[in-house]
């Protein structure tokens, strides 16, 4: 009998939906031994380690939550080294991984003609040390720093409301942007793959999935074991932000294909890095490497 681990966060804004639409329905599944992993309020790395120790070959992990929950499941599977299949359902704010896999509800995973495919995630290395795997995108700089807004109590309360969650989140992001965009340097002077980047560059992005922050369109680089797309831009400039957003929503996020990026700062720097909404700030950073991971995921894709 196949073991199914449902990963969820009881403190998430849509936990009641998860309880009714996933946890309850899982009890009716035939052929599965259902277990649950409840994300704790400990550090994300602690959750990754705990979940990884539970996994065995042949397991299926179902992430029922937002991208933050999904990234715990992804990293736990890859850390375990076991032959585990991942499925993702969208119960968060942006749900970029679920959008990439096109799994919208319980039936898409268990009762449809969904396929198991290989998924090639991004790997983030900071000063030679592994940081995290990311499935859909990585940002460094201003956009990465802005995700800290979602951890503030005021924002968490607004995101628990049944209606207006998305509008509220975008409004708060816009307010943060205009308040902070000229306050400091988000990306100190750096070279990308040996090439000095333009002054006032505020953001680096690596894109691997179909979407980024819900509304920005990506591609299918996650199916490629070697290449993804990258972009460096001056998004503290409002005009350039509008141009980028317009192109990304109407067409596709602009970018250049790469088989790996090395970011080298002229001086040791403090920078924010985020992967699918989970961010961290690093001090005295000299180099950051983004590349396709040496391990691939098995995923259920609709």
Regions of interest found by a model, annotated:
Residues 7-9, 89, 207:
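Short hydrophobic segments within beta-strands
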Residues 205-217, 279:
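Glycine-rich phosphate/pyrophosphate-binding beta-alpha loops
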Residues 143-146, 199-200, 211-216, 238-239:
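Short acidic/glycine-rich loop or secondary-structure boundary segments that cap or lie
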Residues 192, 196-198, 217-302:
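ATP/nucleoside-binding phosphotransfer catalytic cores, i.e., glycine-rich phosphate-binding loops
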Residues 65-66, 139:
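Helix N-cap/beta->alpha junction signal
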Residues 1-64, 71, 75-76, 103, ...:
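ATP/NTP phosphate-donor binding region
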Residues 11, 138-142, 207-211:
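Glycine-rich beta-alpha junction loops
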Residues 16, 80-203:
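Catalytic core of DAGKc-family lipid kinases
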């Amino acid at each position: 009998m196949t073991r199914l681990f449902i990963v969820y966060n009881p403190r998430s804004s849509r936990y009641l939906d998860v309880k009714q639409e996933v946890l309850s329905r899982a009890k009716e599944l035939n052929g599965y031994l259902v277990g649950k992993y409840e994300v704790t309020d400990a550090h994300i790395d602690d959750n990754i380690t705990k979940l990884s120790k539970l996994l065995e070959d042949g397991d299926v992990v179902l992430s029922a939550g937002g991208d933050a929950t999904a990234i715990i499941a992804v990293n736990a599977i890859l850390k375990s080294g076991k032959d585990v299949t991942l499925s993702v359902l969208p119960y968060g704010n942006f749900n970029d991984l679920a959008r990439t896999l096109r799994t919208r509800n319980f039936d898409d995973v268990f009762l449809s003609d969904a396929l198991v495919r290989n998924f090639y995630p991004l790997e983030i290395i900071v000063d030679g040390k592994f940081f995290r795997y990311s499935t859909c995108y990585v940002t460094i700089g201003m956009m990465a720093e802005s995700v800290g807004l979602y951890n503030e109590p005021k924002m968490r309360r607004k995101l628990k409301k049944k209606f207006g969650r998305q509008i509220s989140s975008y409004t708060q992001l816009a307010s943060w942007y205009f308040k902070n965009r000229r306050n400091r340097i988000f990306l100190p002077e750096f070279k990308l793959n040996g090439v000095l980047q333009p002054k006032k560059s505020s953001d680096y992005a690596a894109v691997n999935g179909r979407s980024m922050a819900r509304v920005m369109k990506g591609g299918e680089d996650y199916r490629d074991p070697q290449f993804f797309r990258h972009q460096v831009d001056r998004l503290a400039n409002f005009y350039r932000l509008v141009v980028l957003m317009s192109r990304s929503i109407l067409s596709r996020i602009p970018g250049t294909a790469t088989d790996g990026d090395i970011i080298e700062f002229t001086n040791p720097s403090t920078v924010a890095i985020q992967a699918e909404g989970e961010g961290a700030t690093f001090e005295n950073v000299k180099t950051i490497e983004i590349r396709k991971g040496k391990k691939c995921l098995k995923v259920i894709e609709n």
